[in-house]
Amino acid sequence: MSAAASPRSLTLIGAGLAGCLLAILLSRRGWQITLYERRGDPRIKGYESGRSINLALAERGRHALRQAGAEDAVMAKAVMMRGRMIHPVSGEPQLQRYGRDDSEVIWSIHRAALNVTLLDLAEQAGARVHFYRRLHTVDFDAGYARFIDDRDDQPHEIHFQALVGSDGAGSALRAAMQRKAPVGEHIAFLDHSYKELEIPPRADGGFRIERNALHIWPRGRYMCIALPNDGGTFTVTLFLPNEGMPSFATTRSGDEALALFARDFPDALPLIPQLKEHWEEHPPGLLGTLTRERWHLDGRAVLLGDAAHAMVPFHGQGMNCAFEDCVALAEQLDAHSDLSEAFAAFEAARRDDAAAIQQMALENYLEMRDRVGDAQFLLQRALEQQLQARWPTRFVPHYTMVTFLRTRYAIALARSEIQREILLEATHGHTDLSRIDWVALETVVHARLEPLEGAH
C-alpha cells in the first residue's frame, strides 16, 4: 500500500460466511478490518439466517479455510458424505459414490455452526465486528456510510476507505452501488421453490438413516434431499414447482404435505415427525441466479460471493465459490497497492468462473431430480468411471473437477461438455459396456482432452 492509503483498512458489509473468512485472511495480512452486520450476534441471540440449507464443503472451500488457518476448527463440526443415497418410491436405497474412495468425499456442515466458528476466528485475528448495523445509505464520494440499528432506529455514521459487500444475495451495498451507478443487475428465478424440514436423531442420539451420505428422493420435476448434521439430525429440503401438480400451489396445508409425502416419499414420512407443524411454520424459499455487469465501483466498493453472483444450491458450490472469492480478493490486494486496480483485477479473475458454476448449478438440478435413477445415466456413469481408471489425467469426471480438485470452474465446464459428448456417443444404442470400442475411445479421449493439471 502507498503511504497515502495507510493504514490499510477495509469495511466489510455482512458478517456471514464470506465476510468472516475474508476478515480472517486480511487481518492476518495486517489489514484493519471492521465488519458491520444487520443481525444480532449469533453467539448470544441464536442463529437468525432464515435459511438453514446445510452446506457442502468441498476442496475449494477447504483450501480457503487452510489459507485462513481455520480448517481444523471447521472440520471438527463437519460430517463426511461419500455420495448420493438414492431413495426410489419403492425398493432399497442405493449409494452412488461421488469419487473413487474415501479420499474423494464432501462434507456437510450446518450454516450456523460454521458462521459462529468463523466469527470467533475473525475476532481472534483482530477484526472488529459491530452487530445490529443495517446499511442504510452510502456517500461514496465523501466516504461516509450510515447504518441503522433496527432495535431503536438509531443511526450510526462511519467514515470508510473502501467497502466490501459480503452481505449476500439481497446485498444492501449492491443496492447502494446501483443507486450511484447502474451495475447491470439481472435476477432469473427458478419456477421452483424450497421448504425446510428436519429428521430428528434417534432416542439414543444416533442417526435415523445412513449418516455419511447426501440422501436424495428424486421424483422427476421435484425432489427431496437430506444432509446430515453432527448432532444426529438431518436437514431436509423439499424442492417443488411453484405451480402445477404437485406444487406449492397445491400443497399449502400441513395435511396436504402429509399426503404428498405418503404418496411420493413413503420411507421419508416416518422420519419427519414434525412435518405438519414445520410445513405450516416455514414459508417457501426462492431460488434464483443473480448476475451483474459490474462488481466494483472504482476503488470505493467491491462485491463478492452471493452479493456478486448468487446461484441455485444444487451443486453445493455457493459457499465454496464465495470462499474462493475471498482468497482471490486477498491475493489481488497483495498484488496491487491501488484499490481500484485490485478490485478490477479480482473481478476479471473471477467473472468467467462465477458464470460457469452458476450454469453448472442449474444443470446439476436437472441431473439430481430427473436423471440419477435413469438407466442411461447410470450407464454413462459406469463408462465415466472406466475412462477415468484408464486415462485418469485426461478423462476427469465433472464432479471430480468441481468438487475434489480446484480446476477453474470455466475450464471444468468446457471439459465437461466435451466429456458429455464422448459419453453420449459411446453409449448410444448400448445397454451395458460389453461392446464398447475401447481402441476408438482411446483415440477420441487423447485427441479431445489434454492432461488436466492436478488430476491423478
Curated annotation (Swiss-Prot):
UniProt-recorded Gene Ontology molecular function terms: FAD binding; kynurenine 3-monooxygenase activity
Keywords carried by this UniProt record: FAD, Flavoprotein, Monooxygenase, NADP, Oxidoreductase, Pyridine nucleotide biosynthesis
Pfam families tied to this protein: FAD_binding_3 (PF01494)
Enzyme Commission number, as recorded: 1.14.13.9
The protein's enzyme class: oxidoreductase
Ranges in a coiled coil: none
One annotated GO biological process: L-tryptophan catabolic process
Transmembrane segments: none
InterPro entries, per the entry: FAD-bd, FAD/NAD-bd_sf, Kynurenine_monooxygenase
Keyword presence, Flavoprotein: yes
Cofactor names: FAD
Disulphide linkage map: none
Biological or metabolic pathway of the protein: Cofactor biosynthesis; NAD(+) biosynthesis; quinolinate from L-kynurenine: step 1/3
Annotated catalysed reactions: L-kynurenine + NADPH + O2 + H(+) = 3-hydroxy-L-kynurenine + NADP(+) + H2O
Role of this protein: Catalyzes the hydroxylation of L-kynurenine (L-Kyn) to form 3-hydroxy-L-kynurenine (L-3OHKyn). Required for synthesis of quinolinic acid.
Family: Belongs to the aromatic-ring hydroxylase family. KMO subfamily.
Protein name: Kynurenine 3-monooxygenase
Organism phylogeny: Bacteria, Pseudomonadati, Pseudomonadota, Gammaproteobacteria, Lysobacterales
